[in-house]
């Protein structure tokens, strides 16, 4: 597999949440997902203990069932006060947020159509330890997404399915008492690979040197 010609800074700054540009019609080979997981496992983990787990969902019926749950949760989110298209009073910011909202709406309606869904999880000895160790899977999932981008795949970090985590666990046979789900992402080839850095604040706005 040929990797995209991206230097480290380009990879880090152009790995975006991809929604409307996911190619749902193109299958993603299992070995390619495995390669991304191999890279993800190089991420840091507490005490060098590998408790992160990746549930790769290729089965169409399971993807559809998870997609229905996600869509129902998203519909409630859209009706809430945290929906990203709420006016802010800043015209430029509002335009950006409208684009984000439109993109999120699309994923809310179509996530189950992605050729692959991946759930990043953490395994513990019981529910409490599984939740306490979620810090292991979070950097690993970001590494997974960087590896996917380098291979021409798109992802979108989501977690709202966790409000119905038990139902998703039941669909996939995930042992709820010992495995905590952290992240759900679609995985698909992207329509084009020309992604750009997002608008972000100047670093000096968010840096506090030697204290707050």
Regions found by a protein language model. Give the residues of each.
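N-terminal targeting/leader regions
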Residues: 1-27, 31-35, 39
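C-terminal helix-cap and adjacent tail motif
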Residues: 2-4, 14-20, 180-212
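Small-aliphatic-rich amphipathic alpha-helix that forms the alpha element of a beta-alpha
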Residues: 38-40, 116-171
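Glycine-rich, charged/polar anion/phosphate-binding loops
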Residues: 39-42, 102-105, 168-171, 191-194
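Glycine-rich phosphate/pyrophosphate-binding beta-alpha loops
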Residues: 43-49
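Short, surface-exposed beta-edge/turn micro-motifs
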Residues: 51-52, 114-117, 181-182
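Glycine/small-residue-rich phosphate/adenosyl-binding loop
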Residues: 56-137
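A glycine-rich helix N-cap at a beta->alpha junction
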Residues: 75-87, 172-197
């Amino acid at each position: 597999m040929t990797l995209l010609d991206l230097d480290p800074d380009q990879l880090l700054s152009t790995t975006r949440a991809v929604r409307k540009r996911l190619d749902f019609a193109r299958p993603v080979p299992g070995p390619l997902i495995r390669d991304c997981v191999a890279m993800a496992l190089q991420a840091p983990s507490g005490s060098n203990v590998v408790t992160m787990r990746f549930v790769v969902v290729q089965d169409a019926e399971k993807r559809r069932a998870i997609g229905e749950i996600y869509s129902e949760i998203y519909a409630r989110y859209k009706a809430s006060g945290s929906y990203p298209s709420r006016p802010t009073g800043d015209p430029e910011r509002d335009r950006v947020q409208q684009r984000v909202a439109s993109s999120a709406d699309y994923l809310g309606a179509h996530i189950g159509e992605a050729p692959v869904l991946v759930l990043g999880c953490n395994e513990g000895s019981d529910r409490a330890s599984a939740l306490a160790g979620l810090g292991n899977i979070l950097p690993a999932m970001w590494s997974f997404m960087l590896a996917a981008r380098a291979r021409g795949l798109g992802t979108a970090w989501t977690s709202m399915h966790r409000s119905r985590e038990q139902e998703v666990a039941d669909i996939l046979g995930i042992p709820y008492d010992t495995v905590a789900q952290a992240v759900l992402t679609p995985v698909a080839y992207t329509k084009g690979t020309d992604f750009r850095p997002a608008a972000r604040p100047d670093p000096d706005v968010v840096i506090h040197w030697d204290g707050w």
